[in-house]
Design a protein with these regions (language model features):
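Short beta-strand His + acidic residue motifs that chelate non-heme Fe in jelly-roll/DSBH
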Residues: 60-63, 80-82, 104, 110-116
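Conserved hydrophobic/aromatic beta-strand scaffold that supports enzyme active sites
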Residues: 31-33, 49-53, 70, 93, ...
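Double-stranded beta-helix
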Residues: 2-11, 85-88, 109-136
Length: 136
C-alpha cells in the first residue's frame, strides 16, 4: 500500500505537449503525480493518478496519447474540446465544473482551458493500453 498526501508531491510546470510531431505551448498548467506504477517499456508508468492545476486563462492545447484518460473536475470551470482526428477541427465542446468527469479514449485528440477567474483543478487517471512494441 502506498499513502501519499498531495502536498508532498512535486508541482511540475508543464510548458509543452507534443502533437503530430510538433511541440505546442501549454499555458499556466502544472501537475502533481499522486501515484504512478509499472513500466510501459518506454519510460512511462502503466497506471497513474495526477492532480492538475490550471491558472485563469491557462490551457492545454490539442494533443493525444495511447492511454485512456478519465478526468474529474475538483474546482473551477473548464471548456473541454474534442477534435476530429482527420482535420483537427473542434467537433465537441463542453463546459465542465466540479463533480464532472470526462472520459477520453485512446488516441482521441483533445484539449481544454480554464474559463474561471481562479486556479482550477482536476484529477486525471491514466492507464496505458498499447503493446510495448507499438508506437505511432
Amino acid at each position: 500500500m502506498e499513502v501519499v498526501h498531495w502536498k508532498e508531491c512535486e508541482d511540475k510546470k508543464i510548458d509543452k505537449f507534443p502533437y503530430r510531431g510538433q511541440m505546442h505551448d501549454v499555458i499556466g498548467t502544472s501537475v502533481r503525480w499522486l501515484s504512478k506504477h509499472g513500466d510501459d517499456g518506454h519510460g512511462y508508468p502503466e497506471y497513474g493518478l495526477r492532480l492538475f492545476t490550471i491558472q485563469p486563462g491557462g490551457r492545454i492545447p490539442i494533443h493525444n496519447h495511447f492511454y485512456h484518460q478519465t478526468m474529474y473536475i475538483l474546482s473551477g470551470e473548464f471548456e473541454c474540446w474534442e477534435f476530429d482526428p482527420a482535420t483537427d477541427e473542434v467537433i465537441k465542446k463542453a463546459i465542465c465544473g466540479p463533480g464532472t468527469s470526462i472520459y477520453i479514449p485512446s488516441l482521441q485528440p483533445h484539449g481544454m482551458k480554464n474559463t474561471s477567474d481562479q486556479p482550477s483543478t482536476f484529477l486525471c487517471c491514466i492507464c496505458n493500453v498499447y503493446d510495448k512494441e507499438t508506437m505511432l
